[in-house]
C-alpha cells in the first residue's frame, strides 16, 4: 500500500476541533492500515511533523434506509494522531483568527 493512499481525509467535527487544542489531529484512514503505517504516512505527507502516538478507532457500519430498501454504510477507520512537543502544527487544520 502506498503511503499517500493511507490518509483519506481529515475528520472535522466538534469533538475533533476540541482535540486540536491538545495537539491531536483526527483523520479517516484506510481500513487495512496499521498504526506504524499511519505514522509513516503522516510524517511523509506533512513536512516537519513528528508523531508521538497513534490511536485508531474502527467505526461500525450504520443501517440506512432509502424508501423500502435497507442497507449499510461502509465501515471506516479513524486515526487520532498526537504530535510531539517540538513538532510543527499541521496546516490543514489551521483556524484563521478574525
Curated annotation (Swiss-Prot):
One of its GO terms (biological process) is translation. Signal peptide: none annotated. Keywords: Ribonucleoprotein, Ribosomal protein, RNA-binding, rRNA-binding. It holds the Pfam family Ribosomal_L23. GO terms for cellular component: ribonucleoprotein complex; ribosome. One of its GO terms (molecular function) is rRNA binding. InterPro entries: Nucleotide-bd_a/b_plait_sf, Ribosomal_uL23-like, Ribosomal_uL23/eL15/eS24_sf, Ribosomal_uL23_CS. Part of the 50S ribosomal subunit. Contacts protein L29, and trigger factor when it is bound to the ribosome. Belongs to the universal ribosomal protein uL23 family. One of the early assembly proteins it binds 23S rRNA. One of the proteins that surrounds the polypeptide exit tunnel on the outside of the ribosome. Forms the main docking site for trigger factor binding to the ribosome. This is Large ribosomal subunit protein uL23.
